């Protein structure tokens, strides 16, 4: 892009470009190649309740939140995640919230850990 987001600089772009040049895209794309297999392997746990303390953090502009199942999964958190200690949708943030909102994410994580 002509203008980089505030959370990425030219050194970051150079690093990623060098790594993709060195190793290619295969590793990153393998996640998508295995979606069906992952679904099959995880089928025995579909609908399982996660009782451990948990927290959900996402960016409101994250495309994953627009997936058809995302809203229904979030709506079911009270049932599927009874140990949920926070559900945070960060305004204006996208998919890379740990980079885009590092200080805010760190504060949420530290608060979560302090509460354990």
Q: Language-model segments: which ranges?
A:
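Alpha/beta-hydrolase
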Residues: 1-68
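Alpha-helical elements of Rossmann-like donor-binding domains used by nucleotide-donor carbohydrate transfer enzymes
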Residues: 15, 27-34, 72, 76, ...
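Short alpha-helical interface elements
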Residues: 40-45, 56-57, 79-81, 106-115
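Conserved loop-alpha-helix segment in the C-terminal half of the alpha/beta-hydrolase fold
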Residues: 48, 55-93
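Catalytic active-site module of serine/aspartate enzymes centered on a nucleophile-bearing elbow/loop
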Residues: 82-116
């Amino acid at each position: 892009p002509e203008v980089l987001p505030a959370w990425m600089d030219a050194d970051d772009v150079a690093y990623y470009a060098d790594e993709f040049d060195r190793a290619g895209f295969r590793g990153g794309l393998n996640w998508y190649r295995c979606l069906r297999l992952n679904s099959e392997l995880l089928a025995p746990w579909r609908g399982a309740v996660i009782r451990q303390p948990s927290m959900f953090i996402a960016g409101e502009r994250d495309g994953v939140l627009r997936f058809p199942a995302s809203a229904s999964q979030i709506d079911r958190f009270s049932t599927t995640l009874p140990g949920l200690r926070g559900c945070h949708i960060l305004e204006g943030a996208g998919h890379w919230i740990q980079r885009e909102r590092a200080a805010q994410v760190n504060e949420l994580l530290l608060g979560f850990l302090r509460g354990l």
